[in-house]
């Protein structure tokens, strides 16, 4: 609740005379609203004003209903007003002499308020708050005043000539107030502008004076003159004029005005030089003179035409050859006339109609082309212009430059797998553009490094490929993946049976940028120990891990007694297999060994003077047990627990309860009364105890009366502390008591070895006293001899000679079997502590690396075209197209190293040529034709020719025909040749027969060999020779 509200409550409670007095409706305001109120409006009611969105409230926003005469109600202050917001409104700093601001700060915008308070010893008249109005004035009331409460006042200030002050027509002035002086127009204030009334009743300074203000003479005006009035008082005007060739820039006159605390001339003009624009250029000509952009007034330029451009063509100047820079009516520089022109004087020159393929003419189309005519070309969509798009008809009747050509733009060059192209983010690929390819580390480029865009819009040669590079190992291997170097991942690896992928090693490979190849490792699959079964055992060892494929066989233990056996339930053999989990698993659950029993049943059991304390009731089956206890006064004789055996009897026999013979009368006695009857119970002690004497227990019964039992007394046997040895210690150093059976172990300090028994035990001697089992050992200094054991590397081998033991600094070189990778150092050394440093390495099985797809060979194929993954051991077979010969191994095998066993073969084109002499050949061969490898031809001769040789031949890999091509011989030589041939055949036959008869005659052995390899067949034919011109022959 505000102060006004509190006042209203106060009036309502304290001044009951105001009850029933009310105020009229609050004054309305434009563009505003009044808070809700109810009628009648009682004294003490507060109403609030607010303005619409774009209006500002000027004045107090709340009014209070009060009464001054206790008769009528009235509002305590006038209503505020709402002014439309003026964003440009700005009020000056408000000053209240004798007061100060308590709220409000600069700048003062429309609607801002300032609240004042008076200084000490001053009181306020007027409203303490004022608002900045749209008219840049403070309102809605005048600024408040602060009146001094001191009795001393300053006297009234005198008037000054040609000036005024803020306290004119005012009497004395209260201390703390100030007076401001100002001069009339044309005068300057000399002295203090503001003087203050002091508390002493005196002014802080003497009143100032107002002196007439005058401007200084303007002096010389560059490139012109100025006309000044005789007296340069405030308000006079000076006029400016420019020399010829200059023009006035700025106002033509300047005025003497007051400026701050002095006087000055208003802005003065300058005389700027008049310039003409650059002389207009002319086609086929030039001008002599100033060629700058701004040419001075009065300058002259002279025009001339260019030299003859070519033979038969010259230029003629038409118009005035000289121009002068002058001014127009607007004082703007201009040339005295238009520029001349140079026109050609040509003979009859005519150029042919220009042509362009895959393009068109976009301008300059004519039926006839003469000297200097130009045409502009553009290409069809998808083609690029090569050359100048504009050509000109010259004086020789030809086009220059020559007509362009339209070439097709290439598509973006393709990306390659495992590589990149250097296209510099180009979006357009014109003919002639070259793109360079490169491969990522670990890959090698196959094909040309660069391709080029041809005018047909295609790339040539074919785009290269990035094939997997062979790793040239540097010998460096990392067990963790490198973070900032290229690693070629292994995605094709697999492990053999009994192994699974587990971890990787990274082999560094040589290259322009060293890179790494991931090698997957195989971990042997192992199973946990096979389950242990009750009443049975398995053939497995006591290993913690069992290798994959291990089989164990279960058997049952022998029967616990005769007639009882254990039967194996389940599979007797289980095998270590693999699953998708981290470890191997057994192929099945372990079997069970269950008892195989006949119908066993023992008789009902009962003892006199006793009772059963545990066990079931009858009937009793195998291994059922019963436990007995005797009644008080009876002693159990026999075993307290019996068991039902397989033979239907109890084991041991059923006990009996016998009446106790000794009824205890008193506590044990150390001395036996004379004449007493004694019964010995036990005269010795258990192991670990020493007999120290006897005691006597008094007994009494009806038959014997009083008698005594002799009872032995036993104490625990102790040993003295074991001996301390030099350069060593034993495990009982911190113990105080050593009982019978306790054991201590000795060990020596570093550099000493133990001589004697390592362990001693507390025992008893012949007299029953405690003693150690032997003498204490000794610690002797160790001789400087080093013996390292023979290092065993599973899946590996030693490169140097093997010994049973190794001495200090002996070095062993080890390596892993093929298919395994080493984890550790290949070189180990025998250390003085009989160990190998840096430790015996291990060999980890490498994963089977899948081979990459085998390379294709031009003009051939292989059998692996539809196979996605090539595992170790897989093979492919290459073959060539018809007419091509396979060069290299046809069969390639994928190795465990992930490479192919041989380089891929290639297909070599093999051709056989036709013979140079083809006379008489009618069919089978064509002149100058090349025949592919394997081709078979069958020859036929023309009439009058005879075939000599085999009619069929085949093209071989050495480019030769096999058998050699036959020839066609003219039949005119046939009779002679046939006769010679017949004679040679007959002569050969006779020689063979003669040699055969001679050899048989000498050997006197005749036999027949039926072997097809050595058999021969002779057939004699009659040869006819026919002369077509002599039928009689």
From Swiss-Prot:
Localization annotation: Cell membrane
Record CDD domains: CCP
InterPro entries: SEZ6_CSMD_C4BPB_Regulators (IPR051277), Sushi/SCR/CCP_sf (IPR035976), Sushi_SCR_CCP_dom (IPR000436)
Signal sequence interval, chain numbering: 1-20
PROSITE patterns, alphabetized: SUSHI
Family: Belongs to the receptors of complement activation (RCA) family.
Disorder cited: Systemic lupus erythematosus 9: A chronic, relapsing, inflammatory, and often febrile multisystemic disorder of connective tissue, characterized principally by involvement of the skin, joints, kidneys and serosal membranes. It is of unknown etiology, but is thought to represent a failure of the regulatory mechanisms of the autoimmune system. The disease is marked by a wide range of system dysfunctions, an elevated erythrocyte sedimentation rate, and the formation of LE cells in the blood or bone marrow. Immunodeficiency, common variable, 7: A primary immunodeficiency characterized by antibody deficiency, hypogammaglobulinemia, recurrent bacterial infections and an inability to mount an antibody response to antigen. The defect results from a failure of B-cell differentiation and impaired secretion of immunoglobulins; the numbers of circulating B-cells is usually in the normal range, but can be low.
Protein name: Complement receptor type 2
Name of the encoding gene: CR2
